[in-house]
C-alpha cells in the first residue's frame, strides 16, 4: 500500500490540505474550550445548588434575621470563596431594608422600605444570574456552528479529491478514497465538538432555570416577611 493509500487517522490529517487542517485545528480548539466550560459550569451549578440548600435550611430554621444578616456579612468578608446566590440576595435586601429604616426613623414608610429591599434583591439576583449563565452562549454557539464548520472542511476536501481526478486517466475508488476520508474527518470532529456542547447547554439551562425559580420564590417570600415586620 502506498503512502497516499494509508487511511490511518494521523496520516489522513497530515496529508490533508492546509485549509482542512486549519478547520480541524479550529474545531479541536473549540472542542477543548467547550469541555473546559462544561466541567467548570458543572462544578459551579453543583456548588450553587448546595449553597442554596444550606442557606434555605438556615433561613427557615426560625433564627433571628438580623443574626443571619450579620452572619452573611461575615461570610462575605472572611470567606475564601464566593458566598451563595441566595445568601447574596438576602444580604442585599436586608442591607437596603436596614438603610431605609435607619434613615427614616422619625417617619417610617413601610412601602419605601419594602420597595427598596425588593429592588436591591432584584439587582443582586440579576448579577448572580449573569454569573451562573456565563459561557452558556458559547456552548450554544459551538453546538450550532461546529457542524457547519466541519461540513465546510468536508466540502473542501471532496472538491480537492475530485480536482485530483483531472490528472489521472482512470478514476478509481482508491484514487479518491483518501481525500474523501480526510474530508469526512472534518465532519466527524465537528459533530464531536457540537454534540457535548448541545447536551451540556440544554442540561445546564434547565438546572439554572430551576435555581432561578427558587431565587425568585425566595425574593417574594422574604418580601412578605419584611412587609409583616414593617407594620
Task: Show which residues each predicted segment covers.
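Hydrophobic membrane-targeting segments
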Residues: 1-57
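Gly/Ser/Thr-rich beta-alpha loop segments that engage phosphate groups in nucleotides
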Residues: 145, 152-155, 159, 181, ...
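Hydrophobic alpha-helical transmembrane segments of polytopic membrane proteins
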Residues: 183-197
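Hydrophobic alpha-helical transmembrane segments and adjacent short intramembrane/lumenal linkers
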Residues: 169-183
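Alpha-helical transmembrane segments
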Residues: 28-48, 151, 158, 193-208
Amino acid at each position: 500500500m502506498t503512502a497516499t493509500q494509508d487511511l490511518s487517522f494521523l496520516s489522513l490529517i497530515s496529508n490533508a490540505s492546509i485549509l482542512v487542517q486549519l478547520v480541524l485545528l479550529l474545531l479541536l480548539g473549540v472542542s477543548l474550550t467547550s469541555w473546559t466550560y462544561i466541567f467548570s459550569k458543572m462544578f459551579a451549578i453543583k456548588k450553587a445548588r448546595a449553597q442554596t440548600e444550606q442557606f434555605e435550611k438556615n433561613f427557615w430554621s426560625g433564627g433571628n434575621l438580623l443574626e443571619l444578616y450579620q452572619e452573611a456579612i461575615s461570610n462575605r468578608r472572611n470567606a475564601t470563596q464566593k458566598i451563595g446566590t441566595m445568601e447574596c440576595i438576602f444580604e442585599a435586601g436586608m442591607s437596603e431594608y436596614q438603610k431605609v429604616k435607619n434613615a427614616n426613623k422619625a417617619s417610617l414608610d413601610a412601602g419605601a422600605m419594602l420597595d427598596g429591599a425588593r429592588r436591591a434583591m432584584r439587582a443582586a439576583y440579576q448579577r448572580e444570574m449573569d454569573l451562573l449563565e456565563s459561557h452558556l452562549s458559547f456552548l450554544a454557539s459551538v453546538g450550532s456552528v461546529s457542524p457547519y464548520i466541519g461540513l465546510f472542511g468536508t466540502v473542501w476536501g471532496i472538491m480537492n479529491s475530485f480536482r485530483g481526478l483531472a490528472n489521472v486517466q482512470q478514476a478509481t475508488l482508491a484514487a479518491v478514497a483518501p481525500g474523501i476520508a480526510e474530508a469526512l474527518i472534518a465532519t466527524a470532529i465537528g459533530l464531536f465538538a457540537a454534540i457535548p456542547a448541545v447536551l451540556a447547554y440544554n442540561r445546564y439551562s434547565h438546572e439554572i432555570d430551576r435555581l432561578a425559580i427558587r431565587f425568585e420564590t425566595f425574593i417574594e417570600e422574604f418580601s412578605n416577611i419584611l412587609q409583616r415586620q414593617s407594620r
